[in-house]
């Protein structure tokens, strides 16, 4: 019985009809309402956390691009240790620069000295194989960042899809119980089935109240993730192009 209080608080703040419907629900209906309520808590937690993360990522991405484009050499921020870790672009940049350093070090150059001496061009030149290696590192990192941004989005998609069906299940179950009681009592009076039907319909209402915010939040977050994914792809191409211009082959 105590577990029912998980759903009592929000329902008690609603009008008397919703509270009455919950009270007259079957145990299965109450259980479904409680499950939906708990799912709603997790859904809102994921949406709020994810939205804050996306806002910070967008802001840090803007700052990172401004700082990167102000420098004369593509590896300047890497050398200066100017980190923008909240931006999904920064890991791409960091690992690409690290790969560049590995390639140049394999040619007998000290990466730090080489970068500092290459602000206005480099005496070292990179061939297509070396550029492709750096590009592959950048693209793999971009894929990893895309997966990180999409983490927990599956839960929101599941909530959007499953909540209405779970509510519908509760409604069908409740209506079935209501008609069973009508047969048991041997009466077709509306007063005999109305309480059970009211409780049954409550699960659909709660299911929709969970699904609608989930759907809106999912679409908003998907739009931001799509925008950042495009930013990552564009930056990856820009970075490789800048590296080619500074270390172009003879």
Residue spans of the language-model regions?
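Juxtamembrane loop-transmembrane helix junctions in multi-pass integral membrane proteins
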Residues: 14-30, 148-154, 158-161
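Residue-level signature of catalytic and energy-coupling elements of molecular machines
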Residues: 26, 44, 77, 93, ...
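Hydrophobic alpha-helical transmembrane segments of polytopic membrane proteins
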Residues: 199-214
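Hydrophobic alpha-helical transmembrane segments and adjacent short intramembrane/lumenal linkers
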Residues: 186-200
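Lipid-exposed faces of alpha-helical membrane segments in multi-pass integral membrane proteins
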Residues: 31-48, 159, 163-169, 206, ...
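Transmembrane alpha-helix/interfacial motif
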Residues: 25-73, 77-79
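Short, strongly hydrophobic alpha-helical membrane anchors
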Residues: 1-25, 187-189
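Predominantly long cytosolic amphipathic alpha-helical stalk/bundle segments
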Residues: 59-165, 175-189, 214-250
